[in-house]
């Protein structure tokens, strides 16, 4: 009986520690690092996220920042109005959290690049701070 209880306890602990790993499976082409933890509710698909961001090419050249524009940027998470790396990388953030996203070109601007500031096939780095969440009212 002792052996059975030990095995049950071991398996329970193994599941508890393995579950977060399984739930946060890596997304091909996207590396997420948490620079500062946030608090409260998580952003979900359909919510509006208000963020400050700075974006760099991998050579370190900054190409854009909401702080340079003097105001945060808002978008509907998962709505396809931003690059796919953002839709995937911002989902699950909490208010106050700062994430660094390293995004392969196929989840960014791909073969076309963007406006001369981002060359074709560019891997990008973003620091994104979640300032506020407006929850989606739909069920």
For the regions a protein language model found, what residue spans apply to each?
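Cross-family detector of peptidyl-prolyl cis-trans isomerase
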Residues: 2-139
């Amino acid at each position: 009986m002792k052996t059975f209880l030990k095995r049950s306890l071991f398996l329970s602990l193994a599941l508890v520690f393995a579950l977060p790993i399984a739930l946060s499976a890596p997304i091909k082409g996207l590396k997420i690092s948490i620079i500062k933890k946030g608090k409260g509710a998580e952003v979900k698909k359909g919510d509006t996220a208000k963020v400050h961001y700075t974006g760099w090419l991998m050579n370190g050249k900054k190409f854009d920042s909401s702080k340079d524009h003097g105001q945060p940027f808002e978008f509907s998470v998962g709505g396809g109005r931003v690059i796919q790396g953002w839709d995937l990388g911002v989902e699950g953030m909490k208010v106050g959290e700062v994430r660094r996203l390293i995004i392969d070109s196929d989840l960014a601007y791909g073969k076309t690049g963007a406006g001369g500031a981002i060359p074709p096939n560019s891997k990008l780095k973003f620091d994104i701070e979640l300032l506020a969440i407006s929850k989606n009212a739909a069920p």
